[in-house]
Regions:
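Small beta-barrel nucleic-acid-binding modules, primarily SNase/OB-fold domains
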Residues: 2, 13-161
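Sec-dependent signal peptide hydrophobic core
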Residues: 4-9
């Protein structure tokens, strides 16, 4: 009997809960499905009011850049990628703001990875190194944020509290 109870306790903690539904996109790294506010684990997207720079004109060796709201672009790209389709989020825990941390999928596409690989978010190295190779590829190919210059979202939040 004790073994059965211990087995139930340990397996309950090991099994990850899945949430499936059509999400409301809050920003580039947060979605909401029903009452579940979900942070895409291991990534950090620019904040909604954050401005980044992107090239718009190159003359000889000079590249002129202009400001744009990169957090809004990040959110828009996630909306476009998901469309009006259901996603499956595998809940991995909670963050200090009580949001669920999750890996989310549209079909077989890992949305966390897709955001980083396409340059709309960065790997959140403070919490996970999982998406660093994807970030390196996006940087190498100058995709998304990597086309121009930007302050890492965590640094931007600290400066703009």
């Amino acid at each position: 009997m004790r073994i059965a109870i211990l087995f139930l306790i340990f397996t309950t903690n090991i099994l990850a809960e899945e949430i499936i539904g059509i999400p409301k996109i809050v920003d580039g790294d947060t979605v909401q499905i029903n009452e579940y506010k979900i942070r895409l684990e291991g990534i950090d997207a620019p904040e909604m009011k954050q401005q980044c720079k992107k090239p718009y004109l190159q003359i000889m060796f000079f590249t002129f850049q202009k400001d744009y709201f990169c957090g809004q672009v990040s959110k828009k790209k996630l909306i476009q990628k998901i469309g009006n389709k259901p996603v499956k989020c595998i809940l991995l825990g909670k963050d200090r703001y009580k949001r669920y941390l999750a890996k989310c999928f549209k079909g077989t596409i890992n949305l966390n990875r897709w955001m980083v690989r396409n340059g709309y978010a960065i790997a959140y190295r403070k919490y996970s190194k999982l998406y660093v190779p994807d970030e390196n590829l996006a940087k190498e190919e100058k995709l998304g944020l990597w086309r121009g210059t930007f302050v890492e979202p965590e640094q931007w939040r600290r400066k703009n509290k």
